[in-house]
UniProtKB/Swiss-Prot annotation:
It holds the Pfam family CSD. It comes from the Bacteria. GO terms for cellular component: cytoplasm. It comes from Micrococcus luteus (strain ATCC 4698 / DSM 20030 / JCM 1464 / CCM 169 / CCUG 5858 / IAM 1056 / NBRC 3333 / NCIMB 9278 / NCTC 2665 / VKM Ac-2230). InterPro entries: Cold_shock_CspA, Cold_shock_domain, CSD, CSD_CS, CSP_DNA-bd, NA-bd_OB-fold. It is found in: Cytoplasm. Residues 4-64 form the CSD domain. This is Major cold shock protein. One of its GO terms (molecular function) is DNA binding. PROSITE patterns: CSD_1, CSD_2. The keyword Transcription regulation applies.
Amino acid sequence: MAVGTVKWFNAEKGYGFIAPEDNSADVFVHFSAIQGNGFKELQENDRVEFETQDGPKGLQAANVTKL
């Protein structure tokens, strides 16, 4: 799994981007990929662990967990 920092996340629209620690390209994240109960959102600068998978417009995050 990769580790990164949330660049931004729009809770109203339910998506944002993660900057991976390995300095690779930013990864799209959709609220449905966030693990946990309750309202699923991320905050700017949250550290997260995630997997990547191919999405309709390129790489996207999957199984996102806050650290």
